[in-house]
Amino acid sequence: MARMHTRKRGKSGSKKVYGVEPNWVQYSKDEILNIAVDLKKSGMTSSVVGIRLRDQYGVPTVKAIFGKKLNKLLAEKGIRDEIPEDLNSLIKRYNNVAKHVELNPKDHSNKRGRDLIMAKMLRLVRYYKRTGVLDQKWNLSKVLR
């Protein structure tokens, strides 16, 4: 399948083996959940928490152990981001590109990139409002510079 804003194809990669609980993990489920909650409370994003669990604690994937994704587990513990992580990273990217375009007004390729990022953000906001992740009154202009 082609990518969203280009005609190029994605690259193939290895697939994760699902349904096999890793037996080499040295931590119990409660310990893994407590570590994840502590890391999230320290200000890390969910993806960084997953990377930290993988690299430092030897937990290959939370879903294989719990049967649920990390965000769902953290939401059950009452720890939830008000803006989803993918939308938040797009907002940061948009702000950086917008600042660059202000300083370099003749950079037309980045103006187009800024417009593509905005289109992707609007699409995500529409999806999150429809699924109930974001409030219906939430507005994207509040978080943009």
UniProtKB/Swiss-Prot annotation:
Q: Does this entry carry the keyword Ribonucleoprotein?
A: yes
Among the GO molecular function terms of this UniProt record, one is: structural constituent of ribosome
Similarity section? Belongs to the universal ribosomal protein uS15 family.
Q: Which domain of life is it from?
A: Archaea
An example GO biological process term is: translation
Q: Matching SMART domains, A to Z?
A: Ribosomal_S13_N (SM01386), Ribosomal_S15 (SM01387)
Q: Which GO terms describe its cellular component?
A: cytosolic small ribosomal subunit
Q: What keywords sit in the KW lines? A: Ribonucleoprotein, Ribosomal protein
The answer to whether UniProt assigns keyword Coiled coil to this entry is no
> Which HAMAP family does this chain map to?
Ribosomal_uS15_A
Assembly information from the UniProt record: Part of the 30S ribosomal subunit.
Q: List the InterPro entries hit by this protein, alphabetically.
A: Ribosomal_uS15, Ribosomal_uS15_arc_euk, Ribosomal_uS15_N, uS15_NS1_RNA-bd_sf
Q: Please identify the protein, giving its name as recorded.
A: Small ribosomal subunit protein uS15
Q: Which NCBIfam families match?
A: PRK08561.1
